[in-house]
Amino acid sequence: MEWVTATDGLAFVRVASPSAAEQAWADALAPAINAAIDRYLGSYLGIPSDGEAEIGALALRAFGYGWKYREAPFGEASYVDQAGQSVRLAGDWIVPIKPALNRWRDMGQLLG
């Protein structure tokens, strides 16, 4: 399912006029995030519309993590939050959103 698009992701990270390289990264990143979320959820049949809205918002966050990670492809990516605290980003862009995704995960399918 298309949880996030390159266009929505670029708007989320506040890139109004992306360079060719930025557009190429966004075009690669959005489907990667979508595929990772789909794989993690297993089956999203039966997710209500409010769940789809939440997953869409989480996908934007994952896009933001992936976007920031681009700045340090061979090292640790981090940023400073509004409180001045350093926040380290995981190499797996959906790790920070997995706890919220668990609400919508088809556990029966995963257990067999």
Residue ranges, per PLM feature:
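Divalent metal-cofactor coordination and adjacent catalytic microenvironments
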Residues: 1-112
